[in-house]
Amino acid sequence: AFFNERTVLFASYNNHPIDGVVEKLQQIDYHGHTVPFPILRLGNAEKTAEALRTIAKLYDQCIQLPVPEKLLDKNHADRTARAKQLTELLERYERVLDLRERKETIERLLEARSQMNFRFELEAGQLPQVNRELAAYGDIDTADAMALLDRNEGELLRYLYYTSVQYIRRLAEPKYEDLMEIVRSADNDKEKAAAFNKYISEPENLKKLLRVFPIVATTCISAHRLGDPEPSFDMVIMDEASQCNTAMSLVPILRGRSLMLVGDPQQLSPVILLDPADNKALRRKYSVTEEYDYIENSIYKC
C-alpha cells in the first residue's frame, strides 16, 4: 500500500497488536539510520501526545536531509511497472484456477450421466470453451511471479528511507503551519492532544495529514476521531478481527474504501456485556438469524 501511495488505517480492538506492528515499522534500519517511516500511532490522550512528539522528532530529523529525487522517480517507476505486471500475472492465475474448477465440475457432471440435452450442452459447448481458454492462458509458473518481486534488499531499504524522508518534509509546506503550531505548542500534553483531535476531526485536515502520514494506527474505539464517518482511507486493515465485536468494528470499517480482516476463527469471541435474555428478545423482535447473533459472533465470524 505504501509503495503504491495508498492510505491505510490499521486498527484493532486491543492495543497490543497495534503497538507490535508500529514498533517494527519504526525500527527499520538503513545503514545505521532508522527509517523515518510515516506511520502515526493515535489513540487516547497519552498516545496522541506521544504521536505529536514523534511528528516533531521526525520533522527535525528529516528537514535538512537531501533527497535524490531522480533516483526515487526511477525506482518508483521500476517498482510500479513490476507491481502492474505482478498484478496482471496474479489475475491470470486466479482466472486459470477458476477455469480448472469449472472443468472439474463439468467432468463430474458428465460422469454422473446427466440428461441427454444437458450432457450435449456440456460436451459440445461448455467443456470445449473452458479448454480453449485454459490453452490461451497457458501455464503459469511460480518462477514467473518470483522474478517480479523485489529481491534487492539494499535498494528497497534505500527507496523506503528516502521516500519516507520525502513524506515527512512535506510538513514544511505552508499548508501545515496550523498542524505544526499544535506540535510546537507549549501547552501541556492533554491540551495539545485535545487540539490535535479537534484538528483531525475536520475531513480536510485529515486529508492533509494523510499526505504526510499515509499509515495511521489506532484502536477501533479511537477511530471515531478521524474525520467524518465516511471513507477517508484507501484501505482498513483490522488485526485480531475475531475479537472485535460487530458494532465497534464498524467505526474504522466505514472509514475505508476497502477492507482486510486478519484473524483466527479459533480465537475466543469478543467480550460482550449484553444480557443473553435481551439479546434473545432483540433477535426475535428483529428476526436476526443465528449467523448474525451479536453475542456469538465477531466481525470476522459473521
Spans of model-derived segments:
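Feature representing long, continuous alpha-helical segments
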Residues: 16-19, 23, 211, 215, ...
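Short, glycine/acidic-rich beta->alpha junctions
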Residues: 2, 13, 17, 198, ...
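A general structural signal for short secondary-structure junctions and capping/turn motifs
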Residues: 31-33, 206-210, 250-253
